[in-house]
Curated annotation (Swiss-Prot):
<dbReference type="GO" id="GO:0035792">
    <property type="term" value="C:host cell postsynaptic membrane"/>
</dbReference>
<dbReference type="GO" id="GO:0099106">
    <property type="term" value="F:ion channel regulator activity"/>
</dbReference>
<keyword id="KW-0027">Amidation</keyword>
<keyword id="KW-0629">Postsynaptic neurotoxin</keyword>
<protein>
    <recommendedName>
        <fullName>Alpha-conotoxin PrXA</fullName>
    </recommendedName>
</protein>
<keyword id="KW-0732">Signal</keyword>
<feature type="modified residue" description="4-hydroxyproline">
    <location>
        <position position="79"/>
    </location>
</feature>
<dbReference type="GO" id="GO:0030550">
    <property type="term" value="F:acetylcholine receptor inhibitor activity"/>
</dbReference>
<keyword id="KW-0379">Hydroxylation</keyword>
<dbReference type="GO" id="GO:0005576">
    <property type="term" value="C:extracellular region"/>
</dbReference>
<keyword id="KW-0872">Ion channel impairing toxin</keyword>
<feature type="modified residue" description="4-hydroxyproline">
    <location>
        <position position="61"/>
    </location>
</feature>
<keyword id="KW-0800">Toxin</keyword>
<keyword id="KW-0008">Acetylcholine receptor inhibiting toxin</keyword>
<comment type="function">
    <text>Alpha-conotoxins act on postsynaptic membranes, they bind to the nicotinic acetylcholine receptors (nAChR) and thus inhibit them. This toxin inhibits both adult and fetal (alpha-1/beta-1/epsilon/delta and alpha-1/beta-1/gamma/delta subunits) mammalian muscle nicotinic acetylcholine receptors (nAChR). In vivo, it causes paralysis and death in mice and fish.</text>
</comment>
<keyword id="KW-0528">Neurotoxin</keyword>
<keyword id="KW-0964">Secreted</keyword>
Length: 85
């Protein structure tokens, strides 16, 4: 497992540094690795919805009303708390 991890790390390092050796600017290379439509709201949706829905899904199972309103989860996705604590 550790070997696979380090292989992936080295591949990512090579993926980023190879364009640098060809004269690319770091800011442009890193910007090219991130999707254009990635916004904080999409990241928040991805973190809240868990593994069922990803960043690129068109309609998450809840609505985000922005920072003031927060996110409203349907009852089946709300966390369940144990009483007594």
């Amino acid at each position: 497992m550790q070997t696979a991890y380090w292989v992936m790390v080295m591949m990512m390092v090579m993926w980023i540094t190879a364009p640098l050796s060809e004269g690319g600017k770091p800011k442009l290379i890193i910007r090219g690795l991130v999707p254009n439509d990635l916004t904080p709201q999409r990241i928040l949706r991805s973190l809240i919805s868990g593994r069922t829905y990803g960043i690129y899904d068109a309609k998450p199972p809840f609505s985000c009303a922005g920072l003031r309103g927060g996110c409203v989860l349907p009852p089946n996705l709300r966390p369940k708390f144990k009483e007594g604590r």
